[in-house]
Structures are given as structure tokens and as C-alpha cells.
């Protein structure tokens, strides 16, 4: 293509690999790929390459895996590639200002939210957690702040009542490459129109933790149902019964008022396990005891009915 750009790609997980794959079929020239060092994974803790590294090596691209880009010799790896632009997607390393300034057109990032909403580490999960009606991707010019750069392009998608973080991740992994290719075309032909973020609209997407995913029955049923979808597939909402963690895969909200204390089991039938919350009733539909597969409430009641006796309270 006549407006082909020399591109350095920096990314690590599958989400990033999907963007690299789109670049490789776009007519641009990917001159080098930066990704995180191989990490131990699986039961055997064998060193495993990132999805981005696997794809890059399949395509015969030069791969670089520095632990940090702060050392001068690692920054020189970037400089020696003489790139027009560096594309960063879920890379996992901080880019020092010296690196941000190296490419002719700077560095651009694909972020999984409609900035300035949900800057930070967990934008997909927080959009579900908060009950947002839509989310999307933002392609932005990177600066030294955390997701603070000027916005170059946005694509939105609705959030449905059935979406989990896993399903939303897949939707944004389709949108992101579309937005990236459009943005690169605009950068190449000089039509990109950077837009500053409105600081008054900023929200921060804090990292998730397993402790946050423990079900707090004092919250409303609506909030808990959103948490269950937001924390799926990680870290998974959970409750503790007889000292065992039980993951919750699916639940629904029953708006009926109840005078029972939060955590009180109201009913346990094949239609679900109904539990009082701070507001409304949460109907547990699919659960996973430790060491078992996920199962319907009915199947769990067949083997563990003593866990869910109406009138008892869950911790």
C-alpha cells in the first residue's frame, strides 16, 4: 500500500495477538514485536511464550522480550527499528518518555473502554460492574500518564444483560482491530484529529482481586448479579460454605422485597437458590464447588441440599 507505515507492535495476551494479526493483513510493515518474557504456566510451571510471541514467530517477525524498557540498551532496540509508529495493546510494561518520543508518529494504544471513562487496569470488568449501557475501544496517542493521552478514534458497542467479561472481551477484540486500522490510515494520510480527554468525566478501573469477588450479601441483588458477570472468567464471584469456596457462575435478580437479613436462604428449589440481599433477592442458578465442575442449582441441591436449608444464613 502506498501509505504503508513501519510499525513496532508491543503486546502480550490473546487480545493483543488479534490486533497484531489484523496489522499483518493490513498492508503495513511490522518491523519488530515486543512482548513480555516467557512465564511459567500450567501445573508443570513450564515456561510458556505469550500469544503475541507465538504469532510473531509463526510469521517470522523479529521478537524482543525485555524485562523493562528503562535500560538504555533496551531503548536502543526500539530506536534501531526506525519505526513510523509503535502500536501498544495490553503490553504490560511502562514505556518511558524516551521510547514514546522515538517513532515519527509517536506511540498509540488500544484501550478497552470509551475514554475518559475507565482508565486503568480493568476497564472491561468495571463497565459491567457499574452497570454501564455501553462500552467500546479507544485508540489514543500515548503520553507518560496512565491512559491520559489524546483520543484518536472510538468505537462503541452495547452491553447486554447476558454479557460477561469474557463475552465483552471477545466483542472488543473484534472492534479494536477495526479501530486500529482506521486510525493508522488517518495517521498515514494526515487526517487524524486528536481530541483531549475531559478530566471531569474520568473514572478509574481498579484492578480486581479474589477478595473483592467474595459475595457481600449486604449489596443489592442487582449489584451482585452484575459482579457475577463482571468477575467471569476471573476471579469469579464466590461464597464460602462449610469452609469451602463455591464459585457462582450465573444468577438472576428477583425484585421482591424481603424482611430477612442479608445472606438468609429463602428457598432452594429446581428454579434456583434464593438468597436475601441488601435490596431484593439473588437467585443462584449455576454454582461450582471446589474440585467440581459448574452445575445447575438443582444438581447441586441433589448432592448438597444440607448447604441450602431455608432460614440458614450464608456468610
UniProtKB/Swiss-Prot annotation:
Name of encoding gene: fmt
Function per UniProt: Attaches a formyl group to the free amino group of methionyl-tRNA(fMet). The formyl group appears to play a dual role in the initiator identity of N-formylmethionyl-tRNA by promoting its recognition by IF2 and preventing the misappropriation of this tRNA by the elongation apparatus.
GO cellular component terms, A-Z: cytosol
Pfam families per record: Formyl_trans_C, Formyl_trans_N
HAMAP family xrefs: Formyl_trans
Name this polypeptide is given: Methionyl-tRNA formyltransferase
Family the entry assigns: Belongs to the Fmt family.
Molecular function per GO: methionyl-tRNA formyltransferase activity
Chemical reaction(s) catalysed: L-methionyl-tRNA(fMet) + (6R)-10-formyltetrahydrofolate = N-formyl-L-methionyl-tRNA(fMet) + (6S)-5,6,7,8-tetrahydrofolate + H(+)
PANTHER family per UniProt: METHIONYL-TRNA FORMYLTRANSFERASE, METHIONYL-TRNA FORMYLTRANSFERASE, MITOCHONDRIAL
UniProt-annotated binding residues for (6S)-5,6,7,8-tetrahydrofolate: 113-116
SUPFAM superfamilies tied to this protein: FMT C-terminal domain-like (SSF50486), Formyltransferase (SSF53328)
Keyword terms of this UniProt record: Protein biosynthesis, Transferase
EC code: 2.1.2.9
Top-rank taxon, per record: Bacteria
Species per Swiss-Prot/TrEMBL record: Salmonella dublin (strain CT_02021853)
Cross-referenced InterPro entries: Fmt (IPR005794), Formyl_trans_C (IPR005793), Formyl_trans_C_sf (IPR037022), Formyl_transf_N (IPR002376), Formyl_transf_N_sf (IPR036477), Formyl_transferase-like_C_sf (IPR011034), GART_AS (IPR001555), Met-tRNA-FMT_C (IPR044135)
Amino acid at each position: 500500500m502506498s501509505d504503508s507505515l513501519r510499525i513496532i507492535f508491543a503486546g502480550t495476551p490473546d487480545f493483543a495477538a488479534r490486533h497484531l494479526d489484523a496489522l499483518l493483513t493490513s498492508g503495513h510493515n511490522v518491523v519488530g514485536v515486543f512482548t513480555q518474557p516467557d512465564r511459567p504456566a500450567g501445573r508443570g510451571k513450564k515456561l510458556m511464550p505469550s500469544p503475541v510471541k507465538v504469532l510473531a514467530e509463526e510469521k517470522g517477525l523479529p521478537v524482543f522480550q525485555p524485562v523493562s524498557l528503562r535500560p538504555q540498551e533496551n531503548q536502543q532496540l526500539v530506536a534501531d527499528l526506525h519505526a513510523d509508529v509503535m502500536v501498544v495493546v495490553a503490553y504490560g510494561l511502562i514505556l518511558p518518555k524516551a521510547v514514546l518520543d522515538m517513532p515519527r508518529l509517536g506511540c498509540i494504544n488500544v484501550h478497552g473502554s470509551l475514554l475518559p471513562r475507565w482508565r486503568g487496569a480493568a476497564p472491561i470488568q468495571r463497565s459491567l460492574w457499574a452497570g454501564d449501557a455501553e462500552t467500546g475501544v479507544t485508540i489514543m496517542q500515548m503520553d507518560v500518564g496512565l491512559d491520559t493521552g489524546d483520543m484518536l478514534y472510538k468505537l462503541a458497542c452495547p452491553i447486554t444483560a447476558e454479557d460477561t467479561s469474557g463475552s465483552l472481551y471477545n466483542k472488543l477484540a473484534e472492534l479494536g482491530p477495526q479501530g486500529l486500522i482506521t486510525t493508522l490510515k488517518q495517521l498515514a494520510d494526515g487526517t487524524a484529529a486528536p481530541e483531549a480527554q475531559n478530566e471531569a468525566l474520568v473514572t478509574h478501573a481498579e484492578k480486581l482481586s479474589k477478595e473483592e469477588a467474595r459475595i457481600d450479601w449486604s449489596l443489592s441483588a442487582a449489584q451482585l448479579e452484575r459482579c457475577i458477570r463482571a468477575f467471569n472468567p476471573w476471579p469469579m464471584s464466590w461464597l464460602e460454605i462449610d469452609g469451602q469456596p463455591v464459585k457462582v457462575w450465573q444468577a438472576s435478580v428477583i425484585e421482591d422485597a424481603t424482611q430477612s437479613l442479608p445472606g438468609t436462604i429463602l428457598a432452594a428449589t429446581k428454579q434456583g437458590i434464593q438468597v436475601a440481599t441488601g435490596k431484593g433477592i439473588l437467585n443462584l442458578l449455576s454454582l461450582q464447588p471446589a474440585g467440581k465442575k459448574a452445575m445447575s442449582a438443582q444438581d447441586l441441591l441433589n448432592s448438597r441440599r444440607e448447604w441450602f436449608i431455608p432460614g440458614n444464613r450464608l456468610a
